[in-house]
Amino acid sequence: MLLAMRNLQPDRVPVAPDFSNMIPARLTGKPFWEVYYFRDPPLWQAYIDAVKYFGTDGWFTEGDMQFHYPREYYEAVEDIRKTHERWVVRRRCILNRYPYQKETTYYFADSPTETEKPIKDLQRDCALIRNWFTPPTGYNPSILRQQRQELGELGVFGISIGYPGFQHWFSLFQGGLQDLVYWYYDQHELIAEMRELHEEQALAQMAMILEARPDFVLLSGSGTITLQSPSIARELSLPTIQKLTHMASQAGVPTMLHSCGKQRVLAQWCAQETDLNCINPLEVPPMGDCDLGEIKKMYGDKLALMGNLHTSQVMLFGSPADVEGAARQAIDAAGAGGGFILSTGDQCGRDTPDANIFKLVEVAKTYGRYT
């Protein structure tokens, strides 16, 4: 995995389908709220168990830094409404004297959803936002040590980090993308300030992550040019991507960027304007806009690639034979010379047949061997 991530050629094409959430939770046999609410087991442990079950090359992205922040934070559960299908958990919180509320819906057999988000108004809540994006002052490595030990040699150990932009902020604001778009044009000075605050926090986080020496760092930016236009992404997101990847390059730690949805333009920027090592998931149309062979031809000398079997048409609704054909096609398109990790075009659905994942692994371990 690390050789491929660094755009080198290993003994075979690594295989790491994206199943970081729903499939590991399903394999526990428990209601999903046991995993997401009670952390029994924690999701990261369920993922490692899934890697063992399927025999994939582990792509661990949940390294928990337990950052310390210079702020006072209190949280209490105000109300829980339970049915056999869902638990709706409402929390009251105080961050440095600034109160807010949030609500999370935990489902029996689906990933949770934030049904009330903490920040309601950009201008009214600007003090809360400034406290939200304070840089950390330290971290606690205790869970990192436990996670590394549990993963062992099953895969590569990664820590994720976000960066400024609508793709991150929409999960914080009750009005979501609609409000962010209006504020971008009507209150641009506050959006610009939030970008600077978020970048300052991310750079401090990255310095500590690099001190912890993971195998790689994942820049987590799902929808970077899908949830905002490329022009907005260049203003809000790209400068921080450049700084984060440069820091990691200087430290000798490879970086990968995950951004589902459209990604062709983002791949161009990353190849030509950043120090990024690897990009994923390079989704095909209509969800994305990438052709694996074209991306390999245009940017394969600078970027390792990870992707990109269709998560619904092939992995969820297809047969093992369909998976085998698509996997061979992906290896043919991007496997030459290394620098390729066989994966899916984003998260596999909960009901993806186990047989299809087993077939993907089989193809990588047979057809994906370099001679």
Describe the role of every protein-language-model region.
Residues 68-128, 154:
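A contiguous, low-structure linker/loop signature
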Residues 61-75, 163-166:
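Short, glycine/charge-rich beta-strand/loop segments that flank catalytic centers
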Residues 1-39, 110-371:
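Active-site loop segments of alpha/beta catalytic cores
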Residues 43-62, 208, 212:
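Catalytic domains of carbohydrate-active enzymes, especially glycoside hydrolases
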Residues 16-24, 51, 55-68:
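Ligand-binding clamshell of periplasmic/extracellular solute-binding protein-like
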Residues 61, 80-81, 284:
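Short polar/acidic secondary-structure junctions
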Residues 31, 42, 57, 85, ...:
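Short, low-complexity intrinsically disordered segments
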